Amino acid sequence: MLCLPVFIILLLLASPAASNPLEKRIQSDLIRAALEDADTKNDPRLLDYVTGACCAGLNFVCCGKK
């Protein structure tokens, strides 16, 4: 009868200590995705298109051209 409370206490202590494999996998996926995103570079054609559209819409104010 005395072993039951000890077993329950040990069970309660051990359950939060167990790691969640899904949580670890999600964390590793997020880290890997962040590293892959850090390696990517912007396409200069896309940047030229965006700045061109911005400058055309604002009469070349943002580009410094007149």
From Swiss-Prot:
InterPro entries: T-conotoxin (IPR031565)
Keyword Disulfide bond in record: yes
Reported modifications of this chain: Contains 2 disulfide bonds that can be either 'C1-C3, C2-C4' or 'C1-C4, C2-C3', since these disulfide connectivities have been observed for conotoxins with cysteine framework V (for examples, see AC P0DQQ7 and AC P81755).
Major localisation: secreted
Keyword Cytoplasm part of the UniProt annotation: no
Keyword annotations of the record: Amidation, Disulfide bond, Neurotoxin, Secreted, Signal, Toxin
Record's subcellular location: Secreted
Tissues in which the UniProt entry reports expression: Expressed by the venom duct.
Molecular function terms, GO-annotated: toxin activity
Propeptide regions on this chain: 20-45
Signal peptide: 1-19
Record PTM Cysteine amide, positions in chain: C63
GO cellular component, one term: extracellular region
UniProt free text on domains: The cysteine framework is V (CC-CC).
Annotated family: Belongs to the conotoxin T superfamily.
Name of the featured protein: Conotoxin PnMLCL-01
Organism: Conus pennaceus
